């Protein structure tokens, strides 16, 4: 379900998605597994659409069939420019991953939005192992060079993680 006011620089509305996949290893019969990926994004305009409180939550879970395993490159990861910005890309990896992003965005001037963000995330072997107390967190500031309808370039600077200060330079929106 997608009712954001605009896809590439949302200032109001929401996006909700659940994807389920089944992977079958036809060559070696070692890597048969299922994957679910659920994403929730909500954008709350404050007074006008020049200030926005944006929230994202994502749950990724893989389950291997009996006697099978999930290849490491298909395991959910947390850390990096789209999840936990105070940690390196792919910093945490396991069978289940969850993260939450909170951003306060405002228009500094017509071609530049700024953002303050707070991220939480974790990975675990099983969905049942997810605990709020195990979530890693970080915070930071972001700069989005944009047109009204699209983010052209963004710079995010993340603090608070064990990996030190992280800088991300991307030609894409955060979420």
Give a label for each model feature.
Residues 5-9, 47-51, 110-114, 145-155:
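Repeated loop/turn-to-beta-strand initiation elements of outer-membrane beta-barrel proteins
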Residues 143-147, 164-175:
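Outer-membrane beta-barrel "beta-signal"
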Residues 14-24, 83-90, 114-122, 151-161:
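Transmembrane beta-strand segments that form the barrel wall of outer-membrane beta-barrel proteins
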Residues 1-107:
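C-terminal outer-membrane beta-barrel translocator/porin domains of Gram-negative envelope proteins
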Residues 105-136:
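C-terminal hydrophobic structural anchor segments
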Residues 15-17, 52-56, 101, 113-117, ...:
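Residue-level detector of the transmembrane beta-barrel scaffold of outer-membrane proteins
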Residues 33-35, 95-97, 136, 148, ...:
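Membrane-spanning beta-strands of outer-membrane beta-barrel proteins
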């Amino acid at each position: 379900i997608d009712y954001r006011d605009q896809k590439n620089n949302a200032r109001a509305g929401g996006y909700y998605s659940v994807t389920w996949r089944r992977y079958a290893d036809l060559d070696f019969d070692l890597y048969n597994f299922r994957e679910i990926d659920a994403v929730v994004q909500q954008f709350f305009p404050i007074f006008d659409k020049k200030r926005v409180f944006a929230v994202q939550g994502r749950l990724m879970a893989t389950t291997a069939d009996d006697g099978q395993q999930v290849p490491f490159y298909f395991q959910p990861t947390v850390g990096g420019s789209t999840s936990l910005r105070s940690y390196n890309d792919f910093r945490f990896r396991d069978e289940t991953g969850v993260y939450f992003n909170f951003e306060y965005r405002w228009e500094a001037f017509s071609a530049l939005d700024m953002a303050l963000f707070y991220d939480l995330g974790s990975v675990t072997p099983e969905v049942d192992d997810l605990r709020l107390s195990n979530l890693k967190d970080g915070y930071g500031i972001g700069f989005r060079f944009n047109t009204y309808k699209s983010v052209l370039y963004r710079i995010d600077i993340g603090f608070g993680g064990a990996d030190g200060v992280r800088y991300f330079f991307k030609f894409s929106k955060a979420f």
